[in-house]
Structures are given as structure tokens and as C-alpha cells.
Regions:
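Short low-polarity hydrophobic stretches
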Residues: 1-2, 107, 137, 187
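Hydrophobic/aromatic hotspots within intrinsically disordered, low-complexity regions
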Residues: 6, 14-15
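Internal glycine-rich, Lys/Arg-flanked active-site/core loops of soluble domains
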Residues: 24-168
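Conserved NAD+-utilizing ADP-ribose enzyme module
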Residues: 1, 15, 21-26, 33, ...
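Low-complexity intrinsically disordered segments
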Residues: 11-12, 158
Length: 209
């Protein structure tokens, strides 16, 4: 019976990997197709001409195919895992550099209570090592917080270098902007409002240029 269970587990793992690969391949194909359309129109008012692969790199990030694993590798500073994404990251950084850097107020909803987190003590500077998705619509962040099922955090970000990708995404209703990996943010306030932790951060620099 144990051998049968082991065999079944292996079969299930193989099936899951195939399904994931199929989903990822479909996401890449969709991103390339959309990237081609965006490149023809030069959407997002880039500071230089953007190529189809550059648009596709941003589209792929918003497709949910890789962002969790990519950000986990970046946050863990796992060189082996990051190396897997090196070619993609190089293209992604090139695409981000082509988009105008904007000074704007953004919000981010997180399904974790950061009020007692020592990193988010007022006066501290935190570094976000992942690619950070934010929104220019506070209601998007609030709706995310409502759906987290417990204590959560709504972060207000006074950004200096955000890239507006609201027209370069599969989810245009989220009014999404991105902060680059290595963004440094100073904690200006941290308070509780009912079950919601409300934090204000001010962008003060970046560790990756």
C-alpha cells in the first residue's frame, strides 16, 4: 500500500508540474501577444521606444504566473533561485527604466498585521526587495484588506519613482503601479484603526539603480 501511495504521489506531482507548465506557457503566449499590441501603440508614455519583449515582461509579471516565486526568491536573497530568473529580470529592469518615474501617492493592502513588527517602527527605514505592486486607488487596497479575513495592513506610500502600469496589465481595474526591488521606505506613522493597521511610508532611495 505504501508503494502504491508513493506512486500515486509521484503521479500527482508530475500532473501538477505539467499543469503549471501549461499555465505558464499560456501566460507567456498571452503576454507576448499583448506585448506586441502595446509596443505598436507605445502605451504608458515611455521615455524611449519600448520593444515588444519589454512590454511582454511587464505583462507576464501581472499574469500571476511567476510573481510569487520571483518575489520569494528576491526577498530570500536566494542566488540559486534568482539565477533562474536572471534573463527575465534583466529584461524587466530594462522595461521599468523605459517607463517614466512618477512622484505619486500609492496604497498597498497586505494580509498581515504589521503594527507590532519592529521593522515598521516609526523612524525606521525598510527595504522592499521584491517587485512591489501598489495601487493609485485606495479603495482597491481597502477591498483587499476586507477580504483578508482578519487583521491586515493598509500602507500608504509617498512614492518618488513609481512606474504606472495601469495600461500594461491583465488587470486594468486595479490601477497598478510598481516599485522596483530594493526600494527604501521610511516609516512616518504606524497606528491601528480597528482591526486594520495603517502605515505611512515615504520613499527615500533605492539600493538597486
Amino acid at each position: 500500500n505504501n508503494n502504491n501511495d508513493y506512486s500515486n504521489n509521484n503521479n500527482n506531482n508530475t500532473t501538477n508540474k505539467k499543469n503549471n507548465n501549461n499555465r505558464n506557457e499560456a501566460s507567456v503566449a498571452s503576454s507576448n501577444k499583448k506585448g506586441d499590441e502595446l509596443a505598436k501603440k507605445q502605451v504608458g508614455k515611455p521615455v524611449r521606444k519600448m520593444t515588444m519583449p519589454e512590454y511582454a515582461a511587464i505583462m507576464l509579471y501581472t499574469s500571476n504566473a511567476i510573481y510569487k516565486d520571483l518575489n520569494q526568491a528576491l526577498r530570500d536573497n536566494n542566488r540559486l533561485k534568482v539565477q533562474k530568473y536572471f534573463k527575465y529580470l534583466r529584461l524587466f529592469f530594462e522595461s521599468m527604466s523605459a517607463l517614466p518615474k512618477q512622484k505619486m501617492k500609492l496604497w498597498r493592502g497586505m494580509s498581515v498585521d504589521l503594527h507590532q513588527n519592529p521593522q515598521y517602527k516609526v523612524g525606521n527605514t525598510v527595504v522592499w526587495w521584491g517587485v512591489s505592486s501598489c495601487t493609485s486607488d485606495v479603495n482597491v487596497a481597502k477591498n483587499f484588506a476586507k477580504g483578508c479575513g482578519g487583521k491586515c495592513s493598509i500602507i500608504t506610500i509617498e512614492s518618488e519613482t513609481a512606474s504606472d502600469i495601469s495600461d500594461i496589465t491583465f488587470y486594468s481595474n486595479e490601477k497598478e503601479s510598481l516599485l522596483r526591488p530594493g526600494t527604501q521606505l521610511k516609516v512616518k506613522s504606524n497606528k491601528m484603526n480597528g482591526n486594520v493597521c495603517e502605515i505611512t511610508l515615504q520613499e527615500v532611495g533605492t539600493l538597486i539603480s
